[in-house]
Amino acid sequence: MRFDAADAHWRETPRPGASSAQKDWLTRGGSLTAHLARLGRVTVRVTRETVAAPWADEHRALSCASRAPVWVREVVLAVDGAPFVAAHSIAPLAASKGVWQAMRRLRTRPLAELLYSDPEVTRSALVSRRVLAGHPLFSLASLALARAYATEHAFAARRSVFERRGTPLMVTECMLPALWRHLDAHGERRARGLEQT
């Protein structure tokens, strides 16, 4: 793996003030969608798919120029209707028409369908950070909440780079307050009354 999402802010070890649940979910390997599915029914809402420039803290992880065009896919992963994760995925524009072209056709299917079903795909280490106002991920998470939590001052997020045939695709996942509330109330179980659905 020649790509790495780590930098001065994104680190492999979660920040010291993170809760045990945050440390677990920020470092948990495998498909985040599959982990969420154990908590309830997962739905994917696509909020944006477009060509854009990478964020300031993204281009180095992809080994591309700071203004090189990338394909962006942003979604909200909801569990039983509550937004649990805001996700932002990017790939070099050329790759989104080549090696990673399937990401353009996912619609409301999770990206995990591509990433965990192909033996050619490898993954970098997971890195995480606390996201504050001013970072574009903070705005993305705030929009996902539809102003339901206007007082939220920070979010916990993680990211990693997937590689296929030498070409990167980076996934950044921002955990939303409803996830932590569910884990506080129910642990890794489905909410009461939803076990049979």
UniProtKB/Swiss-Prot annotation:
For this chain, one GO molecular function annotation is: chorismate lyase activity
Q: Where is it predominantly found? A: cytoplasm
Tell me the compartments it is located in.
Cytoplasm
* Disulphides: none
- Is-annotated flag, keyword Lyase? yes
Q: Which InterPro entries match?
A: Chorismate--pyruvate_lyase, Chorismate_lyase_/UTRA_dom_sf
Please note every region of biased composition (Basic and acidic residues): 1-14
Q: Does the keyword Zinc apply?
A: no
Family annotation (Pfam families): Chor_lyase
**Pathway assignment:** Cofactor biosynthesis; ubiquinone biosynthesis
In Swiss-Prot or TrEMBL terms, this protein is called: Probable chorismate pyruvate-lyase
Source organism (scientific name): Burkholderia mallei (strain ATCC 23344)
